[in-house]
C-alpha cells in the first residue's frame, strides 16, 4: 500500500467518522473530499461501504447498554416492544424508496451541485426549525408513538438526496414533530443502525466483486479511522446538544454549500468528475 493511498484512506475515514452522525451530510462531504484528493472508481464504492459500516459499529458500541436492555426485555416488557416496533416502522419507508429509486438517485443526483444546493436548503430549514416555538410531547425516545416513528421514517427518505443528511432530516423532523432535542438525536442514532446496516449489506452484495484481497490494507485504515472518529463525534454531539441548538451546524451547511457553488460558478475547481463514489 502506497503512502498516498493510505493517506487518502485516512482522510476519508476521518470525514466519514466525523460527519456521518452530524447533521451536515456525510455523503456530501465524501463526494467533495474524494474528488479533491482523487479517490474514485470501483474501489471507492467498496471502500465507502467499509467506512460506513465502521461508523455504525461505533454507534452500536456507544449505545450497547440500551441495545442489550431492549434485547433482554423484548419478550416481556411493553416498553422494549414498543421501542422496537417504532424502529421498524421508521425503518421501512427508506427500505421501500431505496429499493425503488436508489440507482436512479445515484445516477442523477450524486454531484457537487446537488450537494451544495441541499446543504444550503437544509441549513435554512434547520435554522427555521430551531427558531420556531416547540411543543415537546416526547421527552425521551420511550415516549414516542408509532405515528412519531412513521413521520421520522418519512423524513429520513429525504436524505436519499446527497447533501441533505440522514441525521439532519431525522433530527429536525423529530423536533418539528414534537420530540425533545435529546429524544430526536438519540432516535436518529438508533434508526441509523438498521438503516445503515441494511444499506451496507445491500451495497456489499451488489458490489461484491469489487472487494479484492489486495485492498484489505486500505480498507483496514479507513475502517479503524472511521470507527474512532465516529465515536468521538457521537459522544461530542450528545454532550453538545445538552446546552446548544443546531444553529451552528445550519450555518456551517449554508457556508459550505455556498462555497461549493462559488467554486463551480467561477470555475475555481473542476467538479466534472465528482460523484464517482
Curated annotation (Swiss-Prot):
Keywords: Antibiotic resistance, Cell inner membrane, Cell membrane, Cell shape, Cell wall biogenesis/degradation, Hydrolase, Membrane, Peptidoglycan synthesis, Transmembrane, Transmembrane helix
Bilayer topology term: Multi-pass membrane protein
Catalytic activity: di-trans,octa-cis-undecaprenyl diphosphate + H2O = di-trans,octa-cis-undecaprenyl phosphate + phosphate + H(+)
E.C. no: 3.6.1.27
Disulfide bond annotation, renumbered to this chain: none
Membrane-crossing segments per the record: 47-67, 85-105, 108-128, 183-203, 218-238, 249-269
GO cellular component, one term: plasma membrane
GO molecular function, one term: undecaprenyl-diphosphatase activity
Matches recorded under InterPro entries: UppP (IPR003824)
Subcellular location: Cell inner membrane
GO biological process, alphabetically ordered: cell wall organization; peptidoglycan biosynthetic process; regulation of cell shape; response to antibiotic
Pfam families (alphabetical): BacA (PF02673)
Note: Bacitracin is thought to be involved in the inhibition of peptidoglycan synthesis by sequestering undecaprenyl diphosphate, thereby reducing the pool of lipid carrier available.
Family per record: Belongs to the UppP family.
Function statement: Catalyzes the dephosphorylation of undecaprenyl diphosphate (UPP). Confers resistance to bacitracin.
Protein name in UniProt: Undecaprenyl-diphosphatase
Natural source organism: Pseudomonas paraeruginosa (strain DSM 24068 / PA7) (Pseudomonas aeruginosa (strain PA7))
Amino acid at each position: 500500500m502506497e503512502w498516498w493511498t493510505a493517506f487518502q484512506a485516512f482522510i476519508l475515514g476521518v470525514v466519514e467518522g466525523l460527519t456521518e452522525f452530524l447533521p451536515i451530510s456525510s455523503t456530501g462531504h465524501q463526494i467533495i473530499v474524494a474528488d479533491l484528493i482523487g479517490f474514485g472508481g470501483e474501489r471507492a464504492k467498496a471502500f465507502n461501504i467499509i467506512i460506513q459500516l465502521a461508523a455504525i459499529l461505533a454507534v452500536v458500541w456507544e449505545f450497547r447498554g440500551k441495545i442489550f436492555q431492549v434485547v433482554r426485555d423484548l419478550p416481556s416488557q411493553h416498553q422494549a416492544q414498543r421501542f422496537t416496533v417504532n424502529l421498524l416502522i421508521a425503518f421501512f419507508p427508506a427500505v421501500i424508496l431505496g429499493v425503488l429509486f436508489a440507482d436512479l438517485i445515484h445516477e442523477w443526483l450524486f454531484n457537487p451541485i446537488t450537494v451544495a444546493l441541499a446543504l444550503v436548503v437544509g441549513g435554512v430549514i434547520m435554522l427555521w426549525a430551531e427558531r420556531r416555538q416547540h411543543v415537546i410531547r416526547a421527552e425521551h425516545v420511550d415516549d414516542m408513538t408509532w405515528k412519531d416513528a412513521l413521520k421520522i421514517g418519512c423524513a429520513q427518505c429525504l436524505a436519499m438526496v446527497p447533501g441533505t443528511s440522514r441525521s439532519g432530516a431525522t433530527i429536525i423532523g423529530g423536533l418539528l414533530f414534537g420530540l425533545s432535542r435529546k429524544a430526536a438525536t438519540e432516535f436518529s442514532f438508533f434508526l441509523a443502525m438498521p438503516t445503515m446496516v441494511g444499506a451496507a449489506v445491500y451495497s456489499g452484495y451488489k458490489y461484491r466483486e469489487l472487494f479484492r484481497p489486495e485492498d484489505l490494507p486500505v480498507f483496514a485504515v479507513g475502517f479503524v479511522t472511521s470507527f474512532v472518529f465516529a465515536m468521538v463525534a457521537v459522544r461530542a454531539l450528545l454532550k453538545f446538544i445538552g446546552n446548544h441548538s443546531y444553529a451552528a451546524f445550519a450555518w456551517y451547511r449554508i457556508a459550505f454549500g455556498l462555497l461549493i457553488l462559488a467554486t463551480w460558478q467561477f470555475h475555481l475547481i473542476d467538479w466534472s468528475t465528482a460523484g464517482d463514489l
